């Protein structure tokens, strides 16, 4: 009798393992997901067991190299164009399945002091960094509501929290992303959808590492932990927020800046 009971337990565990192994993986879409912080997020999600798609709008060769190195599916469109987002999302879902996790990471800068900034510089940043979050989230939202599950994670910035001289366009857009998350979180909560924001500080991306050493040292001197952040540290925040363990967290802002700006 004991042997049979023990055998049943082994069979039951085997069945559970089989079911777990044959479950459909959750699908994650990362905008701007082939470079810098976005690439780290895409790779971390893939390593976490998600099926990942990454969008880009720029260097084809770099994106293809990223895809070849990681096996992550890549798609090219501009998040600033709503119709392109609708068509792109449809293609991703046809290829991979319905999107469960959306990481709005794509962003650009067009820095200028306000007395010199052009409307074009203002509009380009707002269209990508703020309107792009709407353009990507809106076509996915109803599907998440219907399935009663979703994770929307918006990558903002320390400069969306404190502002930055010479970045009135960028700061306004990134601040808008925070407000977007807080408002939409209230609409999604009862449907099992969480909406959160991550505000990175200065991260050791190629762009930051390319600035003159004297400038970089000046930046680091303002960071209490005494170093730049790593893209992988932002990616780990995303992994947590995307997980089932973060289901009680919504409308929140994770500040990851080494203590440079404490809210």
Task: Identify the role of each PLM range.
Residues 113-114, 118-126, 208, 219:
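Substrate-binding pocket helix/loop in short-chain dehydrogenase/reductase
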Residues 142, 186-187, 247:
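Alpha-helical segment proximal to the catalytic Tyr-Lys
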Residues 223-234, 245:
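A conserved structural motif in NAD(P)-dependent oxidoreductases
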Residues 189, 194, 249-251, 257:
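Short, small/polar-rich loop/turn modules that mediate ligand/substrate recognition or access, typified
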Residues 137, 173, 181:
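Active-site helix of classical SDR
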Residues 157:
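Residue(s) in the substrate-gating loop at a strand-loop-helix junction
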Residues 34-35:
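Conserved glycine-rich cofactor-binding loop
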């Amino acid at each position: 009798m004991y042997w049979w009971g023990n055998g049943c337990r082994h069979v039951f565990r085997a069945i559970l393992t089989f079911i777990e192994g044959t479950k459909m993986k959750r699908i994650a879409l990362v905008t701007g997901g082939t470079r810098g912080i976005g690439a780290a997020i895409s790779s971390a999600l893939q390593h976490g067991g998600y099926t990942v798609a990454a969008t880009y709008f720029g260097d084809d060769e770099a994106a293809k190299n990223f895809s070849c190195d990681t096996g992550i599916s890549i798609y090219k469109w501009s998040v600033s164009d709503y119709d392109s987002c609708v068509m792109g999302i449809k293609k991703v879902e046809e290829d991979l399945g319905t999107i469960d996790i959306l990481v709005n990471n794509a962003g650009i800068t067009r820095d200028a002091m306000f007395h010199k900034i052009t409307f074009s510089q203002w509009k380009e940043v707002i269209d990508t960094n703020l309107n792009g979050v709407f353009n990507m989230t809106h076509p996915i939202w109803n599907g998440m509501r219907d399935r009663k599950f979703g994770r929307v994670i918006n990558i903002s910035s320390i400069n969306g929290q404190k502002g930055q001289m010479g970045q009135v366009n960028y700061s306004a857009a990134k601040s808008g992303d925070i407000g977007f998350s807080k408002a939409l979180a209230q609409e999604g909560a009862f449907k099992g959808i969480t909406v959160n924001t991550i505000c990175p500080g200065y991260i050791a991306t190629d762009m930051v590492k390319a600035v003159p050493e004297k400038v970089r040292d000046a930046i680091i001197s303002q960071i209490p932990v005494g170093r730049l952040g790593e893209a992988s540290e932002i990616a780990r925040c995303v992994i947590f927020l995307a997980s089932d363990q973060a289901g009680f967290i919504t409308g929140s802002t994770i500040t990851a800046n080494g203590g440079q700006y404490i809210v």
